[in-house]
């Protein structure tokens, strides 16, 4: 006859990928790259250009024979370089202090950083056009742009856990996509194939 074999016990176990020890710094430290880039490029750009307005040198630069794009490039290139220096410093500290290595495509990481720097420089220019003093620029940059960038980007907690209206607003937040890229590259070993759409969304 047919011999019945008793079924064995089935046990389920949770398996946590990419951060099995549940250390908060592994999740938060890569995101500091995005936060630092936002602070350096957005605030310094808006303050530097508004300062030129206050002391009257911006008008003098405008009437010079240089073209407008040359003037803008001359003002923004130093902040692009400063942004890349900030990325290198944070990645170095992340490796030697927190023992977190970049597992994915480093070239894609720096290319994404460049795109994000361009987007925040644009926001800094936008702030400078609406500000007449450095104090106005600081207040506008921090309260109108930086706070939404941080709280709606998934920096501290997942966007998926937010109310639906905030999830809809987060679609226009460039830091959200940059954090997806940087966490994917550093923690998951991802690259261009997984995050090219996030890179396009930052434009």
Q: Could you describe each region identified by the protein language model?
A:
Residues 19, 32-36, 44, 48, ...:
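Residue-level hotspots within the lipid-embedded alpha helices of multi-pass solute transporters
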Residues 35-57, 125, 129:
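A hydrophobic alpha-helix feature that marks transmembrane segments and, especially
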Residues 42, 74-98, 119-124, 128, ...:
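Hydrophobic alpha-helical transmembrane segments that constitute the membrane-spanning cores
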Residues 1-44:
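Transport-system extracytoplasmic interface segments
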Residues 66-93, 110, 114, 199-203:
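Selective transmembrane-helix segments that form parts of the transport pathway or gating/packing helices
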Residues 26-30, 38-43, 73-78, 104-112, ...:
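Short alpha-helical transmembrane interface motifs in multi-pass membrane proteins
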């Amino acid at each position: 006859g047919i011999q019945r074999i008793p079924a064995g016990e089935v046990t389920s176990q949770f398996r946590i990928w990419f951060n099995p020890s549940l250390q908060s710094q592994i999740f938060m430290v890569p995101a500091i790259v995005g936060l630092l880039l936002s602070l350096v490029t957005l605030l310094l750009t808006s303050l530097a250009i508004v300062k030129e307005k206050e002391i009257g040198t911006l008008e003098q630069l405008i009437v010079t024979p240089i073209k407008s794009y040359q003037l803008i490039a001359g003002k923004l290139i130093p902040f692009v370089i400063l942004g890349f220096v900030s990325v290198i410093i944070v990645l170095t500290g992340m490796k030697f202090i927190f023992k977190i290595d970049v597992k994915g495509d480093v070239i894609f990481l720096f290319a994404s950083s460049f795109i994000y720097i361009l987007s925040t420089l644009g926001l800094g220019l936008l702030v400078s056009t609406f500000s007449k003093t450095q104090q106005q620029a600081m207040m506008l940059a921090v309260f109108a742009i930086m706070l939404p960038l941080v709280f709606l980007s998934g920096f501290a907690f997942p966007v998926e856990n937010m109310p639906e209206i905030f999830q809809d607003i987060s679609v226009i937040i460039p830091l959200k996509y940059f954090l997806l890229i940087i966490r994917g590259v550093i923690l998951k070993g991802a690259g261009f194939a997984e995050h090219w759409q996030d890179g396009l969304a930052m434009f």
